[in-house]
Amino acid sequence: MALPAVIAISLGGMLGTGIFVLPGLAATKTGASLWLAYLIAAICIMPAAYSKSELATAMPSSGGTYVYIERAFGPLFGTISGIGLWLALVLKSAFALVGIGAYVLVVLGMDSAVITKTVALVFLSAVFLLNIVGAKKAGSFQSYAVLAALVVLTGVFFFGLQAADQTTPFFAKLQNDIVEAGGRMDLIFTIAFVYLSFSGVTKVAAIAEEIKNPSKNLPLGMILSLVIVTAVYVAISFVLTGNVGLQDLNENYSPIHTLAVDLSGPGYEINGINVLGAGIAIIAVLTLISTVNAGVLASSRFPFAMSRDGLLPEFMSRVHKKFLTPANTIAITCIAIAATVLFLDVFEIAKLASAFKVMMFVSVNLAVIVLRETSAQWYQPKYMSPLYPYAQIFGIVTGLFFLWFLGAVPLLSILGIFLLGTIIYYSYGKEVMRTGVLKNYGHRPALYLFNKNTKEQPAEEATSIDLSSLDPKIASDAGAIVPLLGNENSPEMLVEIAAAIQSKKKIQALNITEVPSQTDLDAFLEEPPVASSLRRRLSGLSASKNLAVDFEAVVTHELSDTINQLSSQSSCEWLVMAWDGRSHRGIFISNPIGWLLANINSNLALFKDNGVRHVGKVLLALRPGRKDRNFIEIAQRVCAFYDAALTLLHVVPENTTNKNIFAMEEKSSSKLEQTKTKAEVTIVKSDDPVGTISGMSTSYDLLILGTPEKDNWINVLFGGGKDKFTEESACSVLRLTVKD
């Protein structure tokens, strides 16, 4: 699928209710400033388009937003989002059906709410049968309808631009059939209200696997279609409010027909029917039918997919024996749409649909932040969202801001969806074994509040899983486990460090590959070339250095959980991993290292390899007053392994007295007396410990640091100086977390 097809599909998801029905309702809330509401809404939705593009290139065949959210946040939030997405599409389809009824009636010269709903239900019945039988040609029909709509709307714009004379006041609203002065609050409400118009911008992401060069064409197609449809919305809303009075748009569900009739006048009538208006109505009906069909098609897939995932009753995942379509979920969806048409006010339908779409856009932006910052190994998108994470944060903040202005009913409805989703999950889906990336790797502030290891509230123990389920050959008596995730500069150096710091002899090296939960692990029974290469290299290291190294390759759905299980072995003394030494952990969310620091049962050694291959001088930098006996012992092991000299460094404030320095030096020297390697104590006065240690690291081969004893809110939210030592070090760095 080339770029033009991507643009056509994305446009097809937006051109419908957003231009043929919604502008009439929206115009009565803000008047001539309606075009500005569309423009601002498009800008605020842009980050969601970036985010959806990134997610789609990482999971091209996953099935869309529901799976993205389920993968990032887990089955519970997957259930909630699935229901929310389903309801949003149900509401949008119902809104489109009301528009179909309205456009049919204006052509027939009739005006009746009952007949409008009757016509809507007739068209819904036709769409229901079409989806049960299966309509393979619906996509091409939609493309032609969209093209025709664009051509006609362009003509309407140029025809109406010269006649637009009602552009003041800029802010106005219709209150009890009287035009009153509006304000910025009315504009903000309208911005949130028209979010529904852009709900289809990310629709094309669901078929990313069919797109040629998706890393380029998918985001480009989304952005271009968003720009095109925004131009259409802005242009048509400008000429609509400039030519049609707000009284004529009150409860008007066919505003473009009204605009066409006002522009053409009686000269375009044949037998009492305005030709231009009738032509617009026919194109509107065709486009809206396409919208309803796409809505039923997509929305029926959500309960179907959730049932397949064990989150809804089994009967929803059954397919029709003859037509092979999800007949049960299609029927449930169409019944819900019919009930919405019959019993809900049209304005409330649009408002609720917009609210649910706002929440989904927010969730998509949040999912990208979670997946990026947790560094899930399988998450490797071919397209990376620009301006990360600021674009996503902008999308989240503006979305929540506008959501508030939609009023209490949409907010309560969203709360109801959360409650319903939670009930359904605990009724049907609580046995699902998948967990989201956020739960596996840890949301840092949540970790700080709820999972922090304290004497008053011990951390929850990890679920015990038999290690034989990972691999029967994994050594149960290994003193150190070295997970190799593919980001190591030198796996050999990492294994050497593991051998140096542990007190036992055996080392277990594991090449761990994380794959998405929808991928069957049985597809990876054959050892990949990378693992075979690592096996050969570590075998050579074992022979040359006389080390007891076992190597195995492991495939898992949950990287951190697997590492935690491995470290839970009673004999495992150390978990040794490569580390990039990032000082900034991202906004609000930690990477897997943060999760491991709070959850693993063994000691943790993080090694940042700066390319040093000969270790002759080791610098141990510890804060004065720290319990440093364990660190000195480990540093001595490293020095003995490499036959290196040890320097114990304390950096103290400039105002420290000489008396205190002398006492500190005596105490530290006494701790080094029993070392079998060459060792010395160095104390430096400085109010810039990062700069001091960084400068001294140029004279050493390995810097050993401890993990800070406690976090504060600045470090929790934004990262802190604790990693700046590592980031600015000239030599390799070994950061140790010793469990008490």
Predicted regions and their residues:
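Terminal cytosolic tails of multi-pass membrane transporters
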Residues: I369-Y388, S413-S490, I497, T519
